[in-house]
A protein has these predicted regions:
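A short beta-strand motif characteristic of beta-propeller blades
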Residues: 27-34, 68-76, 80-82, 121-133, ...
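Repeated scaffold domains used in trafficking and secretory/extracellular systems
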Residues: 31-40, 78-89, 133-143, 178-190, ...
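Short, conserved, GDST-rich strand-edge loop motifs in beta-rich repeat architectures
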Residues: 42-54, 95-109, 295-310
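Short glycine/acidic-enriched loop and turn motifs that connect beta-strands
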Residues: 54-58, 99-104, 158-159, 199-202, ...
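Short loop/turn segments that connect beta-strands within beta-propeller blades
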Residues: 66-69, 117-119, 166-170, 207-210, ...
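Loop/turn-rich, solvent-exposed surfaces of beta-rich toroidal or solenoidal domains
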Residues: 277-320, 326-343, 347-348
Length: 387
């Protein structure tokens, strides 16, 4: 009984004191509710764009980070399993994704959303044929034409084709069948693209001026898909296409004459101990100013390890065919490098769900050193930057 009375008295004292404090506060200050607001525009400056696919169902998102220190500046969101592209000026994001009745399954539609980057706002939507490939993101799955009039969208049902969207008209103008071929590599002039075929050749599609017609031409065999398969990831070096194989061989190709031709094949890891191979998804990052290729790598390479996180990034001199430097990195699955004389390298890691910034030192044979890191919120394999 005494214990119960003591508890009751303590409770009464606490209530009384709280009432006195509340009364005193009421006399001295007036409660002002907090006003929540949003910025009309992001802070100016160059950005890093990271596409976060949501493989657990629900919306994907593209996050915008400051290229200087990776401060999160903004984001836009779409449906599931998104693919993205960014305009050359960095002011527009094109996001293709799926919207399903049961989040990740059921009936649905595939939609192209076009966003204004400075304001993070949706400008327009275009419903696409319900055929878009729902695959781990790669830049080769969604590409702009050289003048950014057309957008090319990779389809797989599993039959493969490419949807051509006229961005000026805001509509789909044709679907180009490409059986047995996958990936989109736009020509540098006019309207058209090449694609990788399952027999080791490439097919180049040349489109008419209005995007509604096409002609195609197939190349000779470029690589052996059984003994030396190449990644979807690519970049351009002095007009040529660059691809890297699972076994770290660099394929340099020309598409200038309307058909893909081999220029050279260079084994990067030849003579290096440790059975090193390419690792990740976005594995081809070329710096134009210095003619240096950056590739994420890992030791003990074997079948099935090609998508694992990289422990090193190699800087490779394409002209002299020389390995310049091997830098330790943070379990990266994708990289991107800027084109300046003193480049910056960015990377993403699925394992840690982080995006990283690395400073590159041309005076130290293009060694990279971590300068910043930030959370990227989920499963990301692709990234790019803007001026």
């Amino acid at each position: 009984m005494a214990h119960k009375l003591s508890v009751a008295l303590c409770a009464a004292c606490l209530i009384g004191n709280a009432a006195l404090v509340g009364s005193a506060l009421g006399e001295d200050t007036e409660f002002v509710p907090e006003t929540v607001s949003t910025k009309e525009r992001m802070d100016p400056g160059p950005n890093v764009f990271v596409n976060m696919q949501n493989w657990r169902g629900g919306p994907s998102a593209v996050y915008f980070y400051s290229a200087d220190d990776l401060t999160l500046k903004g984001s836009v969101s779409g449906g599931a399993q998104s693919h993205f592209a960014v305009s050359k000026d960095g002011n527009t994001v094109y996001l293709v994704s799926g919207f399903y009745s049961r989040l990740a399954s059921g009936s649905g539609e595939h939609v192209l959303q076009i966003f204004d980057v400075p304001t993070n706002t949706l400008k327009t939507e275009i419903v696409l044929p319900f055929k878009v490939t729902q695959y781990t993101d790669d830049k080769a799955l969604l590409q702009l034409s050289a003048d950014e009039r057309f957008l090319y969208v990779q389809n797989a049902t599993p039959a493969t084709s490419v949807t051509v969207v006229d961005l000026e008209k805001g509509s789909v103008v044709q679907e180009v069948p490409s059986p047995g071929c996958f990936g989109i590599y736009p020509t540098l002039e006019g309207y058209g693209y090449s694609t990788i075929c399952n027999d080791g050749a490439f097919t180049t599609y040349s489109l008419g001026e209005d995007g509604t017609t096409f002609e195609s031409q197939k190349s000779d065999k470029i690589f052996d898909p059984d003994s030396d398969p190449i990644y979807l990831a690519s970049d351009r070096a002095k007009g040529d296409l660059l691809f890297v194989s699972y076994h770290a061989n660099v394929y340099r190709l020309s598409d200038r004459d309307g058909v893909v031709k081999s220029v050279s094949v260079t084994p990067m890891a030849e003579g290096v101990e440790g059975n090193w191979g390419t690792s990740g998804y976005s594995v081809v990052a070329y710096n134009d100013a210095n003619d240096v290729l950056f590739v994420p790598m890992a030791a003990d390479h074997h079948d099935g390890s090609h998508y694992h996180g990289a422990t090193e990034v190699w800087a490779y001199d394409l002209e002299n065919k020389a390995l310049l430097y091997r830098s330790n990195v943070d379990d990266l699955n994708g990289i991107h490098v800027t084109d300046g004389a003193v480049p910056t390298l960015y990377g993403v890691s699925i394992g840690s769900s982080k995006v990283f910034k690395y400073e590159v030192d041309p005076a130290a044979r293009f060694a990279v050193k971590k300068a910043a890191e930030q959370s990227d919120f989920g499963f990301a394999t692709t990234l790019t930057s803007s001026p």
